[in-house]
Amino acid sequence: MRILLIGFEPFGGDAINSSQETVKAVACDELVGVDIMKEMLPVSFKMAGTEICRLIAESVPDIVIMLGQSGKSDFIKIERVALNLMDSSKEDNDGYIP
């Protein structure tokens, strides 16, 4: 089984992104028969979509797990519904606001 595990680079003035740190901390050699590919996406509305498509095409994973960080939450949440809206009141790391 191939798992693509994705985090994001820091943004919004933060020095670290908890999703990036979590992906880094996952031990890849402890699960027999499981190949975990760890990747980081840019916090860029223009680049992230292209990059995730490239990663999936190149690695052909069985499962894709994407982690994220929300400044609005102080605990872990599982997102049940992803709306995939390009909507934000804050700039991405390219200075772009959709």
Can you say where each PLM-predicted feature lies in the sequence?
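N-terminal catalytic or cofactor-binding beta/alpha core of small enzyme domains
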Residues: 1-98
